[in-house]
Design a protein with these regions (language model features):
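Bacterial N-terminal signal peptides that target proteins for export
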Residues: 1-9
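Hydrophobic h-region of N-terminal signal peptides that target proteins for export
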Residues: 11-20
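Boundary of Sec targeting at the N-terminus
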Residues: 19-22, 39
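Structural microenvironment flanking redox-active thiols in thiol-disulfide oxidoreductases
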Residues: 64-112, 123-128
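Thiol-/selenol-based redox modules, centered on thioredoxin-like
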Residues: 141-201
């Protein structure tokens, strides 16, 4: 009987958590997180600047598509050159695919030529669950007033093939261009694709 009750409770909680995930055109959920280099940062630290959140897992084929081609690094560098804050988030739990400590995260970024503003370590999955991050990559764009204006895939082609990048619609690039121009993001919510975020139990 207890097991049945627990199952029913889980079924009731799951939709509530999904509904509580970050919503487009609403204030982005506030957070504080540890960085790979031992600092602590909060979303509030970047008030007045555009922020990108990128969920990542270096072992995921879909992530390797974008890093192996240089696409993710190019987007990071182009965005940060315009003053955008780019926060890479690792929500893989210890023992799960993609889990790394701070030193390993920094080494991976150096080896791949990645250029995020900071890498946030989220081994308990609190930040990932707060935003409803489902896949790696899963992308979010927050405009300077703190409003979430985009969430979803990095682009329109849900494959692990590097050759598809050139013909895909670059959703994140388009969202950032719209924010910079003071326009509404036309495709504000798209389907994320990639490996599931490897949360702990």
């Amino acid at each position: 009987m207890k097991m049945i009750r627990r199952t029913l409770l889980a079924l009731l909680i799951a939709p509530a958590l999904a509904h509580a995930a970050a919503a487009v055109d609403a204030p982005a959920p506030a957070f504080t997180a540890a960085t790979a280099d031992g600092r602590t940062v909060s979303l509030a630290d970047f008030k007045g600047r555009t922020v990108v959140l990128e969920w990542t897992n270096h072992d995921c084929p879909y992530v390797r598509k974008h890093y192996g081609s240089g696409n993710m690094q190019s987007q990071q560098k182009a965005a940060t050159a315009q003053g955008v804050v780019w926060l890479q988030v690792i929500s893989s739990a210890p023992g799960q695919q993609g889990y790394v400590d701070g030193a390993a995260a920094a080494r991976l970024n150096a080896e791949r030529g990645a250029a995020p503003t900071a890498t946030l370590l989220d081994p308990k999955g609190d930040l990932g669950r707060l935003y409803g991050a489902q896949t790696t990559p899963h992308m979010y764009v927050i405009k300077p007033d703190g409003t979430l204006v985009y969430k979803g895939g990095i682009d329109s082609l849900a494959t692990a093939d590097k050759a598809d990048i050139a013909r895909a619609e670059p959703y994140v690039t388009e969202a950032l261009a719209a924010v910079a121009a003071g326009r509404k993001v036309e495709k504000a919510s798209t389907r994320p694709y990639g490996c599931s975020v490897k949360y702990g139990g």
